[in-house]
């Protein structure tokens, strides 16, 4: 949506009219930014040769070029759909007016925006964005499923009986076909749920369903073959998780920009902090974006290390060149994110500090007197960010069809153990080997690092506020995480793949030792004391933890009788 304010003049009259207003990115520019990904697909396809005619069996130009473009649309649509639901769950109030009187006053404004009941206009719009993106995601997943079979079989698209029979076998018997069929079903179910649910539990399970679709995506492609299968799959899963939260949230945010502008302008007219609304949304998203950026960068390095063995392969091979371009773009995105956190957000936060800010000790940033200019810089930066993200995802769609320099085939002299598990047999299971052999499981490593960093940060935050936190609880929680790291990345994990005794050590330690020390650390109590409480109707980490702790499911599974039956029954069922 284009701005309606007049351009500034030297006389300053127009400047006065626009003061306190906010600027929103026009939707055509958003479309242009997203189309950068299609351009990246075309350029990367030409550089890597994935669009060239096959030497043995050619599926046709429609499949050669349609498959990477469908994958790009799939990735963008999936990220936008899931990111929009996450944004609705953590950053946007579901209802207008905390009190019935305020709610009645806002009913008229809500109806003017096409919503029903007392649903907040921003919430209604972001869920509409999620619904449309989910439909596109489902259609794109179907396209990828059909085109991937056409590419694998080397047959052009057709309605012949032979193509249909082969496609049915592909979906039923081939891992890639099964994975993409699963994604199609999950995307369709997600699209149905996102159009129907509006309560807290519905948002939670819809978001979980969308994020679960990452699993089949991580299990196919380059990660499904080659060396160190577990590291490749887990690092790719973490990479996709970060991309969905980061790219999806930002794309949903910029598609929401016109509605944000309307709401912010209405608040500004009432002198209730319109620019501050923009700053609040951006600040909440930026926390998720920062965590996602770290996850994407580190998991990308791990995954690249499995595909590239030398600097020559990185700089000379088509696969390596594309990885280098992705890394450079990611650094650029990190720089833009730093500008948001250190420059834009503080100015928007101070935009509604008011004339008495100095007396209250609130120094207003230099540009906060002109929120129009600040919000324009904000959305222009986000447009550049979305274009870079789209280009990176476009390159990734082509990389999925490009052979890496490192061979993905097992060597001819591979041992039976390596053929079955992907790893050679470890040394004899001596006691020392259980503590000296290591094979990092990056999924667990990422979770452990996050929990450790959060716990220490929360404890320091409490101490700065003058609240003491027992050091014994901290040591207990960190010791439990250390045990968790050992059992998932140390000797028990290595021997657990080939020996039943190693597997039982891993199982029992996971269920009976590590949880005890972690529970003694009282992480939920620490979260309740350290996390801020929100009063604007949105649900932050504290509100979601409270909801989970007091949910019926939580009360059921924590009942001593149910917990005992679950523990004993799982052992009987599996062994």
Provide a role label for each language-model segment.
Residues 65, 71-72, 79, 143-144, ...:
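Early transmembrane hairpin module of multi-pass membrane proteins
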């Amino acid at each position: 949506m284009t701005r309606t304010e007049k351009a500034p003049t030297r006389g300053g009259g127009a400047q006065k009219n626009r003061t306190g207003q906010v600027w929103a990115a026009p939707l055509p520019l958003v479309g242009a930014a997203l189309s950068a990904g299609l351009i990246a697909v075309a350029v990367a396809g030409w550089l890597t040769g994935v669009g060239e005619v096959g030497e043995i069996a050619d599926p046709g130009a429609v499949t050669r070029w349609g498959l990477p473009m469908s994958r790009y649309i799939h990735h963008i649509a999936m990220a936008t759909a899931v990111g929009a639901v996450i944004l609705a769950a953590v950053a946007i109030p579901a209802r207008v007016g905390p009190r019935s009187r305020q709610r009645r006053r806002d009913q008229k404004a809500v109806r003017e925006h096409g919503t029903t009941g007392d649903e907040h206009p921003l919430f209604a719009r972001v869920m509409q964005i999620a619904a449309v993106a989910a439909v596109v995601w489902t259609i794109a997943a179907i396209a990828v499923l059909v085109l991937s079979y056409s590419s694998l079989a080397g047959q052009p698209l057709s309605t012949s009986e032979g193509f249909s029979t082969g496609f049915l076998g592909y979906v039923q018997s081939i891992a890639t076909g099964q994975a993409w069929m699963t994604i199609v079903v999950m995307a369709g179910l997600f699209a149905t749920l996102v159009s129907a649910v509006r309560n807290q539990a519905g948002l939670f399970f819809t978001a979980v369903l969308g994020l679960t679709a990452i699993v089949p995506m991580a299990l196919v492609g380059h990660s499904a073959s080659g060396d160190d299968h577990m590291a490749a799959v887990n690092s790719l899963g973490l990479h996709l998780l970060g991309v969905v939260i980061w790219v999806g949230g930002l794309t949903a945010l910029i598609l929401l920009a016109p509605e944000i502008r309307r709401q912010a302008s209405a608040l500004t007219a009432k002198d209730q902090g319109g620019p501050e609304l923009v700053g609040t949304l951006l600040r909440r998203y930026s926390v998720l974006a920062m965590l996602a950026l770290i996850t994407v960068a580190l998991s990308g390095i791990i995954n690249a290390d499995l595909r590239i063995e030398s600097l020559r392969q990185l700089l000379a091979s088509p696969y390596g060149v594309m990885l280098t371009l992705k890394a450079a773009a990611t650094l650029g995105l990190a720089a833009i994110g730093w500008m948001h956190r250190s420059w834009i957000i503080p100015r928007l936060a101070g935009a509604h500090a008011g004339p008495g800010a100095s007396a209250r000790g609130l120094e207003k940033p230099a540009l906060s007197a002109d929120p129009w200019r600040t919000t324009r810089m904000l959305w222009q930066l986000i447009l550049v960010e979305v274009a870079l993200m789209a280009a990176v995802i476009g390159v990734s769609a082509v990389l999925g069809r490009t052979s890496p320099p490192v061979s993905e085939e097992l060597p001819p002299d591979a041992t039976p153990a390596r053929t079955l598990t992907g790893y050679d047999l470890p040394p004899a299971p001596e006691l020392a080997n259980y503590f000296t052999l290591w094979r990092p499981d990056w999924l667990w490593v990422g979770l452990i690092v996050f929990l450790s960093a959060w716990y220490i940060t929360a404890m320091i935050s409490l101490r700065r506020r003058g609240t003491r936190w027992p050091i014994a609880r901290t040591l207990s929680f960190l010791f439990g995480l250390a045990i968790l790291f050992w059992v998932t990345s140390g000797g028990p994990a290595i021997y657990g793949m080939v020996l039943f005794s190693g597997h039982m050590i891993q199982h029992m330690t996971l269920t009976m030792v590590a949880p005890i020390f972690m529970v003694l650390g009282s992480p939920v109590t620490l979260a309740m004391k350290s996390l801020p409480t929100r009063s604007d109707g949105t649900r932050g980490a504290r509100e979601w933890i409270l909801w989970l702790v007091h949910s019926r499911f939580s009360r059921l599974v924590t009942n001593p009788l149910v917990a005992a039956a679950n523990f004993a029954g799982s052992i009987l069922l599996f062994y």
